[in-house]
Amino acid sequence: MNQYVIAIDQGTTSSRAIVFDHAGNIVSTGQMEHEQIFPQAGWVEHNPAEIWNNTREVIGSALSKANLTRHDIAAVGITNQRETAVVWDKNTGEAVYNAIVWQDTRTQSIVDELAQDGGPERFKQKVGLPLATYFSGTKIKWILDNVDGARERAEAGDLLFGNTDAWVLWNLTGGVDGGVHVTDVTNASRTLFMDLETLQWDQEILDIFGVPASMMPAIKSSSEVYGHVHTSQLLRETPVAGILGDQQAATFGQAAFQPGEAKNTYGTGCFLIFNTGEEIVHSKNGLLTTLGYKLGDAKPHYALEGSIAVTGSLIQWLRDNLGMISSAPEVEELAAGVRDNGGVYIVPAFSGLFAPYWRADARGAIVGLTRFANKGHIARAALEATAFQTREVLDAVNADSGVPLTELKVDGGMVANEALMQFQADILGVPVVRPKVVETTALGAAYAAGLAVGFWKDLGELSANWNEDKRWEPQLPAEEQERQLRLWKKAVTKSMDWVDEDVK
C-alpha cells in the first residue's frame, strides 16, 4: 500500500506538500503563498498560524490531486526555511510574536553588543557561524527582550522555540496534545547555539544570550522516526521521519553525499553547499561551517556553505516594489532584449552582504547608470547579480577546500531561466548541470524520511535516481570574464559603509 512519501517544504514565500514515488518523481503538489510582513525597514516577519494552516491545506491538496489517502503514504519528511525563529506558548499553542525571518536585520544591535567581547567570530570555532542577524539565536533573544512578559514565561518553562521545522512538527504531532518538540542537527546548526562536535546545545552560549535551555527542542538526526501524525490530522498515524533545513535538503536531494560534491540552490537567496564529509572544516574565506546531514546513528556529515541573502527576491522586488515586470519569467524576456548589461551592476545588499563579505553596513546599490541604460539593462543586471555572487562564493569554497570544483549542480526556481544558467557557466568557467527533478529540496526531505522507514534501502539507491536534464558549458573568453568580475567587485565596494548613525 505505502507506495509514496510526502515532503512538507515550508519555504520563505510559500508552504508546499509534494508527493514522491519510489523513483523520486513528483506525483502531486500542493502550494500556498503566505504573507510577507514588513513592519519597518529591515524587519521581515511571517505569521506562524498562517504557516501552519497553509501546511495543513497543502497536504490535503497534494493528496486529493493524486487521489491518495494516508494509507498510501509511507512517511512524512519536513524541510524548511532555516533560521526563521518561532517562539510559542506550549500550553496554548499560540506564538508570542510573529516568526522573525532569516532576512530580518533588526537584531544588529544585539550582534554588536555580543561582539564587543571577542568580535564577530566569538563563537565561530564552536558553532561554525559568525555573529550575524541571519541566525536564529539573536532573534530569540530579541523576542525575550522585547515582547511583554516573554522572558518571565520562558523562565517559567512555558515557552518553546523552533525554526519552522520544529513549529510544523510540533503541530503535526498534536500541538498542545502531546506535540513532539524536536529539531534536526542541520536546523540546530543554524541557531548559533549548537556545538558542532557534540551536536548538543551549548549551555555557556545559551547563558550568554539569556535563553533558557527549556525552550530549546531536542536535537535528533535528520533521518529517524520523531513521532507520528496526530489522530486529528489527515495523515494520522503516519510516521514523521525526516527533517533537513532547506539547503541541506537540496544537497541531499541532489545526491551530493560524498566529500567534494556541491550544489547551488537558486531561490529567494542562493546557497552553495560543499560536502566536507566527516571532517569539520573551518573557513578562512567567509563561509559557514554547518551540518550536511546525519542519518540515524551514523556519523554526521559536515559542509561548508556560502549563503547569499538576495537573488530571487531581487526579481520579486522588480515586480512588487518597482512594477517593472508583472511576473518573474518576464525578466528573462527583458534581459534577452539587450546585448549586455549596458555597464549596469546591481548589488542587492537589502539585508547587508552575506558570504563571503558579512558586511551588515552594506545596502543595495545600482551603479554604472547612464542615459543609455534601460529596463532591459536593469533586468539583465539583476540576473547577473545572482551569477556574480555565486562566483565569489565558489572562489571561497575553492580556497577553503583546496580542490577546485569541476562542475556545479544547480536547483531551485531560477534554474528554469536558461539565460541565467548560461551566464552562470560563463562567469564560473565550469559547466553548470541541472537535474531532471529540480524540486530537490522537497526530494531531500522525502529521501531522509523514506530511508528511516525502509522505503529506500540506502544512499546508492538514491544516487541511482539522480538524472541530468541539461548542461551549460562556459563560452565567455577568459579576459572578458575577468573584466566583468573586476567591475562587479568594484560595484560591491560601492554598497559598503552605508549604514551609520544617520541611517534609520
UniProtKB/Swiss-Prot annotation:
Entry annotated with the keyword RNA-binding: no
GO cellular component: cytosol
This protein's record includes keyword rRNA processing: no
Reaction it catalyzes: glycerol + ATP = sn-glycerol 3-phosphate + ADP + H(+)
Keyword tags: ATP-binding, Glycerol metabolism, Kinase, Nucleotide-binding, Transferase
Protein origin, superkingdom: Bacteria
SUPFAM superfamilies tied to this protein: Actin-like ATPase domain
Positions of glycerol binding: 82-83, 134, 246-247
Binding sites annotated in the UniProt record for ADP: 12, 16, 268, 312, 413, 417
Pfam families: FGGY_C, FGGY_N
CDD domains: ASKHA_NBD_FGGY_GK
Pathway: Polyol metabolism; glycerol degradation via glycerol kinase pathway; sn-glycerol 3-phosphate from glycerol: step 1/1
GO MF entry, a single one: ATP binding
InterPro entries reported for this sequence: ATPase_NBD (IPR043129), Carb_kinase_FGGY (IPR000577), Carb_kinase_FGGY_CS (IPR018483), FGGY_C (IPR018485), FGGY_N (IPR018484), Glycerol_kin (IPR005999)
Regulation of catalytic or functional activity: Inhibited by fructose 1,6-bisphosphate (FBP).
Chain residues that bind sn-glycerol 3-phosphate: 12, 82-83, 134, 246
Residues that bind ATP: 12-14, 268, 312, 316, 413
PROSITE patterns linked to this entry: FGGY_KINASES_1, FGGY_KINASES_2
Biological process terms in GO annotation: glycerol catabolic process; glycerol metabolic process; glycerol-3-phosphate metabolic process
The enzyme's E.C. designation: 2.7.1.30
Family label: Belongs to the FGGY kinase family.
Protein purpose: Key enzyme in the regulation of glycerol uptake and metabolism. Catalyzes the phosphorylation of glycerol to yield sn-glycerol 3-phosphate.
PANTHER family given in the database record: GLYCEROL KINASE, SUGAR KINASE
Record protein name field: Glycerol kinase
Gene name for this UniProt entry: glpK
